[in-house]
Amino acid sequence: MSVEYINPSTSAPPRGYSHVVKHGNTVYIAGQVARDRDGKTVGVGDAKAQVDQVFKNLEAALAAAGGNLSHIVKTNIFMTHREDLAAYREVRAKYMSNDNPPVSTLILCSGLADPDFRIEIEAIAIVP
């Protein structure tokens, strides 16, 4: 089985990593942050705007691998502000069903790669 490295044109070009690696039906998605396709941070200081951009980036990553958000089986969420949990849950509900949610780990941390980032989500998906 070959390994495919994918960097969607709708995402900011990565430096030193791939946004998506697909091996067979398994898709590994690098931590997605609130950057648009031009590399600009979206929603500085605005948790909802940042979570929304992260889910848009996850959608783009999965689409590039032939999948969608319903194919996610595992997420790791890194957040810098505990008070952003409600905003995260609210925005996540717009993108993901609660019928069969993926397994998930949420980690509160003191910071991410850019001090303006409030959230980062990495995922594993199984696509048909």
Name each model-derived stretch:
Residues M1-K56, A60-V73, M79-P128:
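N-terminal presequence-like segments and the immediate start of the first folded domain
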